[in-house]
């Protein structure tokens, strides 16, 4: 128990000192408690003090993880806390009998709109401003609006003007029907103020304050001062609650050199109810990454698709939208957002991405420390080089090299090689591995370049021994650690060890090795496909052969060298074509075979 609390306490030390909300999770990933804080780190540290209440002690015994969402102000944290508690109803939060929430200002959707306080949202085209945490401030500002702007207060039409008309607080729309333009101007002024444009009104209040002080009417001066403060308070722009009935996901991608942090803010009925963070180590450009992520994320089996997906980068979305809607039977839209509110949401996403990135890097460092112990290394595996071999039935055999630094992909260290030591059709992974390890580390030694701290081979004991024999031949087996990872059982093999190491699924150290292995596998297969595609494309240059037939030639006959060994009759028979076309294929293959080169990197 104490150990898990110590781990949580260390995690809390890394949290930001800004305002925001925090969520405490149980072992089964259930939210136990949601809180807010002006200073997240300081607030959460209090949970680990000796002198805490019995209820808090019971809570902390069940907490296994804490997540934070940063906000732009304490005010926004308060609103977000309210929204999250209503959405998730955690066991350790207060359960209210009603669900009344914070008050808002409503401007009704009518010819002559009314302006009043409400706690209920009605989807009838009305405009809502807020919510406002301090109801007293809201009342003062509404009182100021009612006295300053001549909007209607009475509910029914009348033949005679109302009391407010005689007090100069109403245009008289209760008995006249020809004041639409004038009334519209009054309402627009109110909108202007509620959107935060209050400088002119503040100046007017300041002048009135000076006047009443001159008359020594200090009671009025105090009221005006309080009204001024209230006006400033409620004019603060907040972005946590947007009044609409759509469910909307905002997706922001925070790119760094070797890692992408993908932040998703999920809004439901205009309220932020969930934050989802994903980490991506792929080498996609930002536009490709957004498209790929949205496709994979929203087409997954249990993912609920919102009414709208907002992104902060312009990309082509027509095909993605169509695919999601067809697969999930939805009617979502993907839109590029650059509104004022969207920009503020993006700013909040950036803040949360940076916090998540810091936590991720800390976890990576712990995973590397763990890997160092497991592999019995003398130093941290800061640089890992991973190798894999790919071929097509022994043809176009290639090797890939990927580099990871501090557990993350380092694209400048990626290489691909054509294997020279194998004949076409020869399948020998051990020989291919020996060649690539020899070429790579002979070059590093000759050029006096730094060796990696760890080499990872995609394969089992045989592939490992082949690579290790080359390291011994180069006399660097004591300068670099080498291991292999067998995909089928995810077993780690080390030289001179008879038994492999099996780590639990999800182990952070194993995850690093899997990432390196999978990336080297992807790179090798990608290069192999490229070479095969080039052959296919070249075949399609023959007159009378299209893409489909070119692909069939590759599948049926193999490489240029294979075709070179066949005569026209054999080609015609295998491909079921006439002799004339077979001669064209034979001639083209002979020409290409002469041009074919076997080396990309020496």
Curated annotation (Swiss-Prot):
<dbReference type="InterPro" id="IPR036876">
    <property type="entry name" value="UVR_dom_sf"/>
</dbReference>
<keyword id="KW-0228">DNA excision</keyword>
<dbReference type="GO" id="GO:0003677">
    <property type="term" value="F:DNA binding"/>
</dbReference>
<dbReference type="Pfam" id="PF22920">
    <property type="entry name" value="UvrC_RNaseH"/>
</dbReference>
<protein>
    <recommendedName>
        <fullName>UvrABC system protein C</fullName>
    </recommendedName>
</protein>
<dbReference type="InterPro" id="IPR004791">
    <property type="entry name" value="UvrC"/>
</dbReference>
<keyword id="KW-0234">DNA repair</keyword>
<dbReference type="InterPro" id="IPR050066">
    <property type="entry name" value="UvrABC_protein_C"/>
</dbReference>
<dbReference type="Pfam" id="PF08459">
    <property type="entry name" value="UvrC_RNaseH_dom"/>
</dbReference>
<dbReference type="InterPro" id="IPR047296">
    <property type="entry name" value="GIY-YIG_UvrC_Cho"/>
</dbReference>
<feature type="domain" description="GIY-YIG">
    <location>
        <begin position="17"/>
        <end position="94"/>
    </location>
</feature>
<dbReference type="InterPro" id="IPR001162">
    <property type="entry name" value="UvrC_RNase_H_dom"/>
</dbReference>
<keyword id="KW-0963">Cytoplasm</keyword>
<keyword id="KW-0227">DNA damage</keyword>
<dbReference type="InterPro" id="IPR035901">
    <property type="entry name" value="GIY-YIG_endonuc_sf"/>
</dbReference>
<dbReference type="InterPro" id="IPR000305">
    <property type="entry name" value="GIY-YIG_endonuc"/>
</dbReference>
<keyword id="KW-0742">SOS response</keyword>
<dbReference type="GO" id="GO:0005737">
    <property type="term" value="C:cytoplasm"/>
</dbReference>
<dbReference type="GO" id="GO:0009432">
    <property type="term" value="P:SOS response"/>
</dbReference>
<feature type="domain" description="UVR">
    <location>
        <begin position="199"/>
        <end position="234"/>
    </location>
</feature>
<dbReference type="GO" id="GO:0009380">
    <property type="term" value="C:excinuclease repair complex"/>
</dbReference>
<dbReference type="InterPro" id="IPR038476">
    <property type="entry name" value="UvrC_RNase_H_dom_sf"/>
</dbReference>
<dbReference type="InterPro" id="IPR010994">
    <property type="entry name" value="RuvA_2-like"/>
</dbReference>
<dbReference type="Pfam" id="PF01541">
    <property type="entry name" value="GIY-YIG"/>
</dbReference>
<dbReference type="GO" id="GO:0009381">
    <property type="term" value="F:excinuclease ABC activity"/>
</dbReference>
<dbReference type="GO" id="GO:0006289">
    <property type="term" value="P:nucleotide-excision repair"/>
</dbReference>
<comment type="subunit">
    <text>Interacts with UvrB in an incision complex.</text>
</comment>
<keyword id="KW-0267">Excision nuclease</keyword>
<comment type="function">
    <text>The UvrABC repair system catalyzes the recognition and processing of DNA lesions. UvrC both incises the 5' and 3' sides of the lesion. The N-terminal half is responsible for the 3' incision and the C-terminal half is responsible for the 5' incision.</text>
</comment>
<comment type="similarity">
    <text>Belongs to the UvrC family.</text>
</comment>
